[in-house]
Amino acid sequence: MDKRMITDAFEEIKWNGWGDTGVCIKYDEARQLPIHTNGKPMKHLLKFMKDDVLKVKGEFKIKPTPGLTKEEAIKRLPPPVVKQPFVDELRQVLSKDQIRLDAYARLTHIFGKNYRDLWRVRRGMIDRPPDAVILPNNHDDCVKIMELAQKHNVVVVPFGGGTNVTGGVEPNPFETRRMVISIDMRRMGRMLHIDTESGTAVFEVGVLGPDIDEQLSRYGFMMGHDPDSYAYSTLGGWIAARGSGAMSNKYGDIENMILAMRVVTPVGVVETPLTSRPCGVDLNAMFVGSEGAFGLVTEAVVKIERLPEVKRYEGWLFPSFEVAFTAFHTCTRKGIHPCTMRLYDEDDTRLSFAASTDSGLVSTFFSKCFKKYIATVKGWNLSKISLVVVGFEGTKAQTNCQRSELVGVFQAFGATCLGTKPGNTWQEKKYDLPYLRDFALAHNFWADVFETSVLYTDAIHCWRAVKKSFAEVMAENGKNAWIGCHTAHQYRFGCCLYFTFIGGQADENDLKIFLQVKKRAMEVMLQHRGNLTHHHGIGYEHVPWMKRYNGEGGLDAIMKFKKALDPKNICNPGKLLPSPPSEKETPKATQARQNREMMFDKMGIPGALQAHL
């Protein structure tokens, strides 16, 4: 079993970046080369940042932008709001090591891992850290914690792996009077039961991705949920954010994997029934995607998959993203569903090759011979080509049959197979994007992501419109920047569009541009019938659009459900939903207060939060 299951994970991973302490993309000053976490040089990355991101001519050197030290950041922590009677009673039911009031524990439980989070913590812009970190060992501990929190009106913020990128784990800064505790679930990482005949297993939800599969592999099973955050995120986090993994085409999204759960709410424990199919109202659906706003999920029954006999991942090139999209849509209509099918637009394709450490593959892509073949023989525009990675898992017969059908479709659209090397490289590097983001952040760049889910009718139009809106924001601000997109997670009716964007960082005003990008993109995505997020969760980043997305009646129904389970609003306030109405408050006054207490347009903007406190 991974040692992180018997020690406290937050003491081993970075407080100001992604992953374990000491693991990062380094910069070799002598050779002027970024060095990947695998020790290999990323020979084309700086050229990409110069040509595609900044679009500058002449000599180009990156500049390190070191953040605060841990000691300096700790000095910036506001003093805690400690409700002593709550702490005293908590000490009677939990052991000493489960209650952390120290500064480092507080520092490591403030933020998630998006650009805005890390930009602020690296600069000591800390508005509302938790006042204590509590580490339950089991479900019963969670019940005791919640009962006391309800009794003493203490705010509870669930914390899994801390990998959230929409503000889901950050305490609400408008909680200036109530004590806020962060519940770190990672001690709860055990598999409690497995039913190999039915194909189910019961886990505590603080279990990390690798530890789920390590425990299941002893029985010849796996879960099949493989998000980018896999190594550091938890089952509870996946449930809370309505997560999706890279292999969702075959194994499903998290809501397809959860069969039952235990939830500790302020008014009692909810246990959803375990059966082959729900009847009536599906209570599981009420808690998946709820981000701790209704209570604390402690245990979950998940469906499990046999370890595949065969795994084959390979790369293809198409003349354009539009052609690749039509090809994969054709596959979907024909019922051809590979485990993974990721289509990169022309910009994301260039980033994929530029960030690679596979010298053979990259050299081939950038070689004159290859370019001549693409331009002369294939008749393609090199600047428009689209990389596609597909994966097949299952029995040998299943994968061969599925691949044969897919090859027929792809070749009909003129695609060129690159073999298994790109697929294997993607498998090895698929968790690396956050390290690239951290490298950018440490060298005067900013980088982040957003995503949506759209119908096929709207997908290409939405892709074009989002990229156009990004270019317009940059032009309005006199900045150069880059945006790329890939699509994955294909469904019968639509797919996910996942955008990555990078720009040069000058000063704190760049965060205002960052927010302009997100606002403009959100408007465009909603205009094209996109949703607020495919798998990142609502957090506080998407709360401003929840009423528009759900409708007034829909949002009111969700808020009344929360009120029934959480009458004092102690469960992760400020996330998922606007602030609840107060007694005797007029609708107009409620709307005005909700706007004042929206975190989206205030966090990290100098003076914005203070003006509304």
Curated annotation (Swiss-Prot):
**Residues that hold substrate according to the record:** R437
Which cofactor does this sequence's record say it needs? Answer: FAD
Q: Where is this motif: Microbody targeting signal?
A: 611-613
Chain intervals for the UniProt region annotation (Important for enzyme activity): 534-536
Q: Where are the transmembrane segments?
A: none
Q: Which GO terms describe its cellular component?
A: peroxisome
Picking any one GO biological process from the record gives: ether lipid biosynthetic process
Family per record = Belongs to the FAD-binding oxidoreductase/transferase type 4 family.
The molecule here is called Alkyldihydroxyacetonephosphate synthase
> From which organism does this entry originate?
Trypanosoma brucei brucei
